[in-house]
Curated annotation (Swiss-Prot):
Keywords: Cell inner membrane, Cell membrane, Membrane, Transmembrane, Transmembrane helix. Belongs to the major facilitator superfamily. TsgA family. PANTHER family: L-FUCOSE-PROTON SYMPORTER, PROTEIN TSGA. PROSITE patterns: MFS (PS50850). GO terms for molecular function: transmembrane transporter activity. It is found in: Cell inner membrane. It comes from Yersinia enterocolitica serotype O:8 / biotype 1B (strain NCTC 13174 / 8081). This is Protein TsgA homolog. SUPFAM superfamilies: MFS general substrate transporter. One of its GO terms (cellular component) is plasma membrane.
């Protein structure tokens, strides 16, 4: 593979994470406007976003096998067509069924693209370089989380319809589409070389179970927290939508900076030990945010939370890919799928909590999930295989 092609594939991975980040994170900003558009209470409206998360989950799960059947390039081109259909559905369809179907299609496109992006990085890079590359790739998720809530707030403040936010997000896939047409992709499945055969036979080990639980709890906790921060800030502290949007942007700015910092730091530390420390610090930072009664402190705590939690999910994926001697697409997709289950459950879990006990209870639940991540990372230390495979020295 020549360097220019590798660079194009790497940028496809970057944009794939930005696309998923934009779709998932912007939900909290537009939810109120969409609820008003369909004349539904916000707690009920949140349940319809499960279609987005379900689409992401199903496509990531199935793509572990589809990547070996349908060429990656063909999947991404087909994804572009689906993206156009979904955004057109949001714009011209004025009923809840069309909205739900369009969100599901967006989820499918996002999941396919993200699973391909993750595989490309794990395929092209090895050892600790894989971890730092994945972390930098994941920073585009948070970069989108920084940019699109601000863009959404600007559009909504000017009384521009909410669906134009999704049209803006669709521009990311235009970039993916153009790069895809110019790139050559690795071949998987029966057409690939025999090097991929040992991957299917190698046992994953118990460590993968703890990584999977940690990935699920982390994403569920993170999104359960950040999706309700705007509602919490406006209702509890009487902030306006711009101030609430700034809180969310602060989180993702800090998250992005943390990723860049840790993409250099991680190569000097054992991945299991550092992810355990980061999970503990993230749990403490979220507790401080949820517990404070001073609105002036919210920005400090959410900045700290964004920074220390930035490397957790990507490190979990990297540790998963290092549980076998040869990187397995199915193992990586399994960890991704578990994380995406957390995405899908975000409003299924937090919606009823908000309806029955209020937004603060949902944030406290997210804090408990972060504590679970810490416990899983701690236990992982007794079962992980990444040291015995020699990956720690790469």
């Amino acid at each position: 593979m020549n360097n220019s092609n590798r660079l194009r594939l790497t940028w496809i991975s970057y944009f794939s994470y930005a696309l998923t980040g934009a779709l998932v994170i912007v939900t909290g900003m537009v939810m109120g406007n969409i609820a008003e558009y369909f004349n539904l209470p916000i707690a009920s409206m949140s349940n319809t976003f499960t279609f987005l998360n379900a689409g992401i989950l199903i496509s990531i799960f199935l793509n572990a096998w589809l990547m070996e059947i349908i060429p990656l390039k063909r999947q991404l081109v087909f994804g572009f067509i689906l993206m156009l259909i979904a955004i057109a559905g949001l714009m011209v369809g004025h009923n809840l069924m069309i909205f739900s179907i369009s969100m599901f299609i967006l989820g499918v496109v996002s999941g396919i693209t993200m699973s391909i992006g993750t595989f490309l990085i794990t395929h092209m890079y090895e050892g600790r370089q894989r971890g730092s590359r994945l972390l930098f790739t994941d920073s585009f998720f948070s970069m989108a989380g920084m940019i699109f809530p601000v863009a959404a707030a600007i559009l909504l403040a000017r009384h521009i319809e909410w669906y134009w936010v999704y049209a803006c997000i669709g521009l990311l896939y235009v970039g993916i589409f153009v790069l895809t047409l110019c790139s050559e992709f690795p071949v998987l499945g029966h057409k690939a070389t025999d090097q991929s055969k040992p991957v299917a036979k190698e046992k994953w080990g118990m460590g993968v179970l703890f990584l999977a639980i940690a990935a699920l709890c982390y994403i569920l906790g993170q999104l359960g927290f950040i999706q309700w921060v705007p509602e919490y800030a406006t209702k509890t502290f009487n902030m306006d939508i711009s101030q609430a949007g700034q809180l969310v942007s602060n989180f993702w700015i800090s998250y992005m900076i943390g990723m860049w910092v840790f993409s250099f730091i991680l190569r000097f530390f054992d991945l299991q030990r550092i992810v355990t420390v980061l999970a503990a610090l993230a749990t403490l930072s979220m507790y401080m945010f949820v517990s404070t009664n001073n609105p002036e402190h919210l920005s400090y705590y959410i900045l700290a939370l964004g920074f220390v939690s930035s490397a957790i999910y990507t490190t979990l994926i990297t540790l998963g890919s290092l549980q076998t001697k040869v990187s397995s697409p199915k193992l990586v997709n399994f960890i991704l799928t578990c994380g995406t289950v957390g995405t899908m459950l975000t409003f299924v879990v937090t919606g009823p909590i908000v309806a029955n006990s209020g937004v603060h209870a949902a944030l406290a639940t997210a804090n408990g999930l972060y504590l679970t991540v810490f416990v899983m990372c701690l236990i992982l230390g007794f079962f992980t295989k990444h040291r015995s495979h020699g990956h720690v020295t790469h």
